[in-house]
Amino acid sequence: MDLATAVAARRKELHLTQLDAAELSGVSERFVRAVEAGKASVQLDKLVGLLDALGLALAVELKR
């Protein structure tokens, strides 16, 4: 599952609108829409805040 799909699925699982998720994480609704649309360039600090508000985490793994 890609990041955009995971964020949208978790937000919906929590019964939150994009505006609700934005307010919980301190970002704009436009930012939430951009993440869920898979936009290539988003600010990492804002992304981490959004993920945290949704109970998700960003992980980095070694390539194999």
Identify the function of each model-found stretch.
Residues A8, L19, V48:
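Short glycine-/small-residue-rich flexible loop motifs, especially phosphate/cofactor-binding loops
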Residues K12, E23, D52:
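Short polybasic/polar patches that bind polyanions
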Residues L16-R30:
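Short alpha-helical DNA-recognition segment
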Residues M1-K12:
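A short, Lys/Arg-rich alpha-helix, primarily the initiator
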